[in-house]
Structures are given as structure tokens and as C-alpha cells.
């Protein structure tokens, strides 16, 4: 009996070894490897993308030129529709240029506007999601590996990514609701790679860009003592501040603001004195954003985030007021 069992064990080990060897020979990598390669390619490659971004029926087209030279990142993101607006990335500085606003610069390492969040995630430390390889597809006349990022629950959105097999650049992404509706789609129409694109580094270096804008937010002490007892898996507090309500035309009032993120999605919770209108879980969806407003104990609570409405409601129900702050 023992000898027979050993034969079975040996057989299973042999089958496993053969399947592992076959997996290695095909060159198929685990999904995490594709995701890490994508983030590195976006940051350190030289390329030009013509792409569209679709959110809630609204479609805009863009051109992104990018290079990485001498340890520095350079990029130009140009809006191809309506009035000309562009964003310039020069190492750790982002400059916004356009005709309908005063140009300004911010100290930040990424272009976050009109690009999907999935490009900047730390996938090694991302919690509460599983990565699934869904095979190959063809996007913009290129072969792409399809990777799905699926939460372990129904309290966060899911993502599907199409990653170019050759360059590892993102060719397409979809942010999907718990009902599988597409909330946001990024799709490349044309990918161009050439050494000549490295010239944008010297072109950007020669530009006279707006001075860094200092955002002076008056440091105030919160008038409210409140806690959040529940958040979706992986969400952590990123920023906690109290702002002067005059900035938002709320005279002599302050607004508590807390920013949370799980590495892919973000949400904000605002608490302020009631403005005279009582809200009872007033909620709506605006593209990928959920907005929820409720009045509790003469205070207005507003939750805005890239999360399902049910998650926002659970967060709201978990907020506790512990009495007025001293």
C-alpha cells in the first residue's frame, strides 16, 4: 500500500514538474510581472501615444510624448480637442499650459490628469486584489496581454488592462463597476517608438515654464471630533487637514478633509457644519466617481471617491462623532 502511494506521489510530482517546465518554455509570465513591466515601461521608455479617454459618454483624444534621459522623466500631454491645453512633465515638476487659464506649475512626479491610475500603482504591495491572466488580444494593430485586476469583494471596482507584448506599454484599460459596466476606458489608437522622440528632453529643458505654485492652506484645528470605523480593504489615510470654508464660499466655517487610497482608487471624506439643507443619503454616480451626501448631527458629510455607491454608504454609516473637539 505504501509503495503504491509513493508511486502516486511521484506521478503527481512528475506531472507538476512537466507543467511547470512547459509554462516556463512558453515564456508566459505571472500577471504581476506584466503589471510591474508596464509601470516601468511607462516611466522609462521613449514613445508617442495617440489615445482616447472615454468617461460616461464623453470622449476626448490626446497625444502623449514621453522620454527618460539621464535619470529624468520628460513628457508632453496635449489635448487634441477643443481649446489647446497641454501638460508638461519635467522631472519632478508638472506645468499646466492653456489659453483659458493662467499657466501654473506643481511639484509632483506624475501626470495624473487624463491618464488611468493603473499606470502608477505599486502592484507588489497592493492588497485585496487578485491578478488574472486572460490571454492575448489585438489592440491598435499590436498583440497585447490581457490582465484583469479583480477585488476580493464587491466593494471596489475592477480593472482590465491590455499590455503591449513587445514594449510593455499600456494599450487599453477599462475600469468596471460591480455590475460590469465600463466607467472609464483608455484606448491607444497608435503607438510610435523612435529614438528621435528623445529630442523632447532638450526641447522641454529649453522651455521657460511657470514658476512653482505654492498652495497655502491655512492650518486650522478641526472643530469636529470624528472617526471612520470601516473602509474597504487596503484603504489607508493619506492626508488629513482642516480647511478654511471661505475658500469654498462658506463664511466663518471650516471643512475637515480626509484623503484615503488603496493604491489604485482614492476617496475623500468631507465634514462641515450643515448649510441649512438636510440631506438623507443623497447619492449619484458621475463617471467613475461616486458622490454621497448626508446630514448627521447638524453636520454635512460628503464622500467622493472611485468606489461603488454601496461602499460609500457603508463608510458613511461607520462615521462616529465623539463630541466637539476642544
What is the role of each PLM region?
Residues 23-100, 132-137, 143, 150-154, ...:
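N-terminal mature ectodomain segment of secretory-pathway/periplasmic proteins
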Residues 208-296, 310:
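Short, solvent-exposed recognition patches
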Amino acid at each position: 500500500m505504501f509503495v503504491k502511494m509513493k508511486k502516486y506521489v511521484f506521478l503527481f510530482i512528475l506531472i507538476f514538474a512537466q507543467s511547470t517546465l512547459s509554462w516556463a518554455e512558453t515564456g508566459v509570465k505571472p500577471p504581476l510581472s506584466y503589471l510591474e513591466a508596464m509601470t516601468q515601461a511607462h516611466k522609462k521608455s521613449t514613445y508617442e501615444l495617440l489615445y482616447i479617454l472615454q468617461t460616461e459618454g464623453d470622449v476626448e483624444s490626446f497625444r502623449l510624448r514621453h522620454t527618460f534621459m539621464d535619470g529624468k522623466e520628460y513628457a508632453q500631454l496635449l489635448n487634441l480637442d477643443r481649446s489647446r491645453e497641454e501638460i508638461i512633465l519635467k522631472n519632478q515638476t508638472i506645468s499646466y499650459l492653456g489659453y483659458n487659464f493662467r499657466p501654473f506649475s506643481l511639484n509632483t512626479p506624475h501626470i495624473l490628469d487624463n491618464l488611468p491610475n493603473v499606470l502608477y500603482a505599486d502592484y507588489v504591495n497592493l492588497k485585496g486584489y487578485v491578478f488574472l491572466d486572460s490571454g492575448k488580444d489585438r489592440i491598435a494593430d499590436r498583440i497585447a496581454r490581457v490582465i484583469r485586476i479583480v477585488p476580493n469583494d464587491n466593494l471596489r471596482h475592477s480593472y482590465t488592462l491590455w499590455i503591449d507584448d513587445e514594449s510593455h506599454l499600456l494599450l487599453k484599460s477599462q475600469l468596471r463597476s460591480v455590475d460590469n459596466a465600463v466607467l472609464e476606458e483608455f484606448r491607444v489608437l497608435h503607438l510610435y517608438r523612435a529614438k528621435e522622440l528623445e529630442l523632447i528632453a532638450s526641447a522641454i529643458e529649453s522651455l521657460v515654464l511657470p514658476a512653482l505654485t505654492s498652495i497655502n492652506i491655512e492650518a486650522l484645528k478641526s472643530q469636529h471630533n470624528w472617526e471612520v470605523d470601516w473602509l474597504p480593504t487596503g484603504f489607508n489615510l493619506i492626508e488629513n487637514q482642516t480647511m478654511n470654508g471661505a475658500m469654498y464660499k462658506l463664511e466663518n466655517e471650516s471643512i475637515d478633509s480626509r484623503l484615503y487610497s488603496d493604491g489604485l482608487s482614492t476617496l475623500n471624506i468631507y465634514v462641515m457644519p450643515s448649510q441649512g439643507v438636510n440631506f438623507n443619503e443623497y447619492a449619484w454616480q458621475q463617471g467613475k466617481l461616486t458622490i454621497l451626501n448626508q446630514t448627521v448631527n447638524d453636520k454635512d458629510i460628503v464622500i467622493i471617491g472611485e468606489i461603488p455607491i454601496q461602499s460609500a454608504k457603508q463608510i458613511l454609516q461607520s462615521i462616529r462623532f465623539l463630541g466637539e473637539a476642544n
